[in-house]
UniProtKB/Swiss-Prot annotation:
EC number: 3.2.1.21
Organism taxonomic ancestry: Eukaryota, Viridiplantae, Streptophyta, Embryophyta, Tracheophyta
This protein's name: Putative beta-glucosidase 15
Region (Disordered): 1-21, 35-103
Keyword Flavoprotein: no
Family: Belongs to the glycosyl hydrolase 1 family.
Active site: 254
A molecular function GO annotation: beta-D-fucosidase activity
UniProt catalytic activity: Hydrolysis of terminal, non-reducing beta-D-glucosyl residues with release of beta-D-glucose
Iron-sulfur among keywords: no
Length: 360
């Protein structure tokens, strides 16, 4: 899918839709079943693009719109990881160890990104191509194409290091799969044609991001202050990465819902919101697979409540409630729903889940 510049419609402060992600999580293996459950776990066999890397980039250049640069250039970096060149075998963490056999003997060279995707909101719906997330692509583009994204080169110019031919050869096509941590979406404002405070982390990108516009949140809030429930964002992220990087296998390495730890015990255990969150995101992930995205698997964050690097013990992502004083672990409603989802046994639908209790 080609990158597209912000057009004349974007002048005056156009807003976009941006999918944000965080941290690396545990793998909960998906079991193939019928319907969209199997679509989530299975790799798509159709919709493969036949463009080579150079051809795809050339077409992307030709699809530029008149006007300024892409409104969103970089996002926040929480974590990026990349293994060495093929042949240097490193032990995978337990959560990914099972993937080695799936690679049919190839080295497990991979990269994990916290991926932000954007839609331009002022062009026709059918033209809502995803705008490049410059932070994630500043790692992926050199690996796949041997150079930084065009927007980075245009804005940062001589401040960017130059890759030698030897470095380009060393970098290119050394990845077997891409891991995406995907949780939410945010609005992104173009700061090339609109006044913005640029003393933020994203300031060099000439972009301003927020989860609220004109007093309205982009989605239902969660305990994680910058994460909102926007299920369609996972499909957007997967489809963009799949198209840009020539159908490299994609794993959703994190996706999950957070609760406040001071929530009463009954609501913590009967976590209806988490069940609805998982249903929504898996539905859109299934849609991406059906459209041809090469999705190899899905990892839910997280199996149990844990210490979060930013919020400590004040928020809970787990399918299992943990009493941190006694270490007792209690399955939540979401744990039982997810078990049924993986095994294909009587998954509760949207109308039933609101009345279902965790002790059922």
């Amino acid at each position: 899918m080609a990158r597209r510049r912000m057009g004349e419609e974007g002048k005056g402060g156009g807003w976009g839709l941006n999918g944000r992600q965080c941290r690396f999580g545990n793998r909960l293996r998906a079991v193939k079943g019928e319907g969209w459950r199997s679509a989530v776990a299975a790799q798509a066999a159709t919709g493969r693009r036949e463009e080579d890397d150079a051809g795809g980039r050339e077409k992307g250049e030709k699809r530029e719109r008149k006007g300024g640069l892409s409104p969103c250039l970089f996002g926040k970096r929480r974590r990026e990881r990349r293994r060495g060149g093929r042949g240097r075998r490193e032990a995978l963490p337990p959560s990914l160890g099972g993937l080695r056999a799936e690679r049919r003997g190839r080295g497990d060279d991979d990269v994990l990104i916290n991926y932000n995707v954007q839609h331009v909101s002022r062009i026709k719906l059918e033209e809502r191509l995803l705008i490049t997330d410059k932070l994630s692509l500043r790692f992926l583009d050199p690996i796949f194409f041997g150079e930084y994204p065009r927007e980075m080169r245009e804005i940062l110019s001589s401040n960017l290091p130059k890759f030698t031919p030897e470095e380009k050869k060393l970098l290119q096509n050394k990845v077997d799969f891409i891991g995406i941590n995907q949780y939410t979406a945010i609005y992104a404002k173009d700061c090339i044609y609109s006044p913005c405070a640029l003393n933020t982390y994203e300031g060099n990108a000439l972009v301003y991001t927020t989860g609220v516009r004109n007093g309205a949140k982009i989605g239902k809030p969660t305990a994680f202050s910058t994460y909102f429930v926007v299920p369609e964002s996972i499909e957007s992220a997967v489809m963009y990465v799949n198209g840009r990087y020539k159908d490299t296998t994609i794993y959703i390495t994190e996706n999950g819902y957070s609760q406040h730890s001071d929530t009463n015990m009954e609501d913590l255990i009967n976590d209806v919101e988490r069940v609805n969150y998982l249903q929504g995101y898996l539905k859109y992930l299934s849609s991406a697979v059906r459209k041809g995205a090469n999705v190899g698997g899905y990892f839910m964050w997280s199996l149990i409540d844990n210490f979060e690097w930013v919020f400590g013990y004040t928020i809970k992502f787990g399918l299992y409630h943990v009493d941190f004083d006694t270490q007792e672990r209690i399955p939540k409603m979401s744990a039982k729903w997810y078990r049924d989802f993986l095994t294909g046994s009587n998954v509760t639908d949207d109308t039933q889940v609101w009345s279902r209790r965790a002790d059922s």
